[in-house]
């Protein structure tokens, strides 16, 4: 019991630190007067643990399979050479155009290039994510990506975002330096909630990612639609998001938005080269792990 109390106190202290960080960030004119609240479970219930144990086994097997593909690639890249079967890039592989999974790009890498990477995953928890299996697959993606990164020693943080009466609600599921080894279970608390004020949420997570010393920083947003909150929508919200993407690119944050709903063209317009069209929801976990794998190289 004493040990549990210590762990809970640590989580409370962590949440307070995250809240202070959130309070100190300038979110821009589009979010003037909006408060950002950080939520994090201080303890994990047996219910969440049981839920995780129920859904996780096939997802963890998928993670392990993806990890096994990394090792020969890392060895190959220590020697330099051409990378093939990439999900995005500037150079098309003419021999791969027949492929239907989108891995049709190539890139040439020099030997000994830096491979260090930190990852942040931000998941839209707006009410519309409850339609169909959107939230289920987003949660599965978080489970796969968390295990994938932790097993390979890649620092990862995972947040969900929505809105509440006070403004923006951010849910901390996994932290870079979590001490209680229970973040995998916290992922099961992810659910559809209210609206989405993407810009403020993105800025917080991007700032969080920028505290990492790794040279490459990958921020993945999973969303099913445009921003939708009181006083924050349409062209103003789009301009805010484009500005955030551009600002953090200058700070070595690579932002990708994985679109999983019916609003794909609007998301494409906002994020342009950072847009990922996820046609089949069941492929979302694999696609996101491949994206991380690509930046690990």
Please name every model-derived segment.
Residues 196, 206, 225-269, 278:
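VWA/integrin I-like adhesion module and closely mimicked acidic/polar interface patches used
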Residues 122-132, 184-191, 226-229:
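Glycine- and acidic
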Residues 109-216, 218-221, 257-266:
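Von Willebrand factor
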Residues 1-119, 133:
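Negatively charged
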Residues 272-297:
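C-terminal helix of von Willebrand factor
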Residues 134-138, 193-202, 237, 284-288:
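Phosphate/oxyanion-binding active-site loops and adjacent basic polyanion-contact surfaces
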């Amino acid at each position: 019991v004493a040990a549990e109390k210590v762990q809970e106190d640590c989580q409370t202290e962590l949440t307070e630190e995250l809240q202070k960080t959130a309070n100190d960030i300038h979110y821009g004119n589009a979010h003037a007067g909006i408060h950002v609240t950080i939520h994090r479970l201080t303890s994990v219930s047996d219910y969440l643990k049981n839920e995780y144990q129920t859904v996780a086994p096939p997802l963890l097997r998928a993670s392990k399979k993806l990890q096994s593909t990394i090792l020969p690639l890392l060895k190959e890249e220590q020697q330099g050479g051409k990378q093939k079967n990439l999900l995005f890039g500037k150079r098309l592989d003419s021999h791969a155009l027949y492929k239907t999974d989108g891995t049709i790009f190539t890139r040439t890498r020099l030997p000994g290039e830096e491979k260090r990477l930190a990852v942040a995953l931000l998941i839209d928890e707006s009410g519309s994510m409850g339609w169909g299996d959107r939230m289920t697959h987003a949660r599965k993606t978080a489970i796969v990506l968390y295990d994938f990164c932790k097993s390979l020693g890649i620092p990862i943080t995972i947040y969900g975002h929505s809105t509440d009466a006070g403004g923006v609600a951010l849910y901390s599921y996994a932290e870079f330096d979590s001490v209680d080894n229970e973040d995998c279970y916290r992922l099961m608390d992810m659910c559809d909630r209210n609206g989405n004020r993407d810009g403020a949420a993105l800025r917080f997570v991007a700032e969080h990612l920028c505290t990492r010393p790794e040279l490459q920083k990958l921020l993945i947003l999973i969303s099913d639609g445009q921003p939708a909150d009181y006083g924050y929508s349409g062209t103003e919200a789009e301009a805010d998001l484009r500005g955030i993407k551009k600002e953090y690119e200058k700070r070595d944050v690579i932002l990708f938005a994985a679109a999983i709903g019916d609003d794909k063209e609007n998301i494409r317009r906002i994020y342009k080269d950072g847009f990922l069209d996820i046609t089949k929801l069941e492929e979302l976990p694999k696609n996101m792990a491949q994206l991380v794998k690509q930046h690990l190289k």
